[in-house]
Amino acid sequence: MSPQTETKAGVGFKAGVKEYKLTYYTPEYETKDTDILAAFRVTPQPGVPPEERGAAVAAESSTGTWTTVWTDGLTSLDRYKGRCYHIEPVPGEEEQFIAYVAYPLDLFEEGSVTNMFTSIVGNVFGFKALRALRLEDLRIPVAYVKTFQGPPHGIQVERDKLNKYGRPLLGCTIKPKLGLSAKNYGRAVYECLRGGLDFTKDDENVNSQPFMRWRDRFLFCAEAIYKSQAETGEIKGHYLNATAGTCEDMMKRAVFARELGVPIVMHDYLTGGFTANTTLAHYCRDNGLLLHIHRAMHAVIDRQKNHGMHFRVLAKALRMSGGDHIHAGTVVGKLEGERDITLGFVDLLRDDYIEKDRSRGIYFTQDWVSLPGVLPVASRGIHVWHMPALTEIFGDDSVLQFGGGTLGHPWGNAPGAVANRVALEACVKARNEGRDLAVDGGDIIREACKWSP
């Protein structure tokens, strides 16, 4: 037990408030391979030194509280406390700085994203000494990564299951998102899959509403899948949303999907919660189901530039909790997304080892060892004229998902699906022949129009 935290009979306990930096600011600390490292963007209240605020973040997200307590003497704070080990200014922002905090691995339950976030992004975000706080990135040590199952199957296993290689996968969200009967919904699924798409998708809002109960939807979608497979000779899927009001109902829906023999289910992992998501991911691996993840509610957490969490942290958490696909923005569609930053967290989803690269927003080198990769899904506000850019930006290991870009075709759902498939095949063929999609993309699509509705 260190001298700072040891309680000795001759000294006694001294109550009172003391500065956080006396205990939790340790610039001389050398980080360990087993530490979880965090980069926080801190906006302190005026007049508070950066060292004190960085130490406060470390304290309030680990062992500290607002005052000295006598039970500090019953454990070793030096072993368990978080440490602010480095502070750097944010270029162009006089009132902000980045505080780097190291957390001992023993603070966290094995295999629990829920517990990790409860500590690191818990009460500290309401700390009144801070005007704003944003978690920019985490370094997850190999020792902790190995306690997680991660994605149920991963990229290579999914391609083997689908027998589809050498191109991005194509998807479509069925619209209108709410209001269709189960039979009409299944009809739209069939038309899109028959037209050439690999997947169709429940919108994140679709659970089990009065106009379409989940069991009816599952049955009609399964019929559409099997009919389109028989007619095209390709393996097809529909993301059946298993998200429900309770974990028990969620699992009931996943079990029914498995009994129908469909290849994939879906979960809204932020609104459903990490505990539910990890439970579903384990079931999917054990039972051969792929798991599509929607990120509904993410903008509540990651939209603000100085408070909350960056999506790269949520992406890392999803890879640990488990999912084979996750929506990751588009760069070219109707949602926000800077190209380099987006590709940074896309690589964090797919690759085994990612080097630190601040130009892409990656604060730490991340080694995922044997954890399977996740396919990024580009969706929202995209159409066939975006196909060259999407193919170039996201590469083969991705899902390109067109909702209105399929169902909005003037000739109907099936021609819209055909148009997307023809555009994708044309872009992949042109790329493989050495053509520059960024330069020739428009010409490639115009040439493909000859063979497409």
Curated annotation (Swiss-Prot):
One of its GO terms (cellular component) is chloroplast. Signal peptide: none annotated. CDD domains: RuBisCO_large_I. It comes from the Eukaryota. It is found in: Plastid, Chloroplast. The modification N6,N6,N6-trimethyllysine is found at K14. Mg(2+) binds at K201, D203, E204. Its EC number is 4.1.1.39. The record marks K334 as: Transition state stabilizer. One of its GO terms (biological process) is photorespiration. The modification N6-carboxylysine is found at K201. Its cofactor is Mg(2+). Residues 1-2 form a propeptide. The disulfide bond which can form in the large chain dimeric partners within the hexadecamer appears to be associated with oxidative stress and protein turnover. NCBIfam families: PRK04208.1 (NF003252). RuBisCO catalyzes two reactions: the carboxylation of D-ribulose 1,5-bisphosphate, the primary event in carbon dioxide fixation, as well as the oxidative fragmentation of the pentose substrate in the photorespiration process. Both reactions occur simultaneously and in competition at the same active site. Heterohexadecamer of 8 large chains and 8 small chains; disulfide-linked. The disulfide link is formed within the large subunit homodimers. This is Ribulose bisphosphate carboxylase large chain.
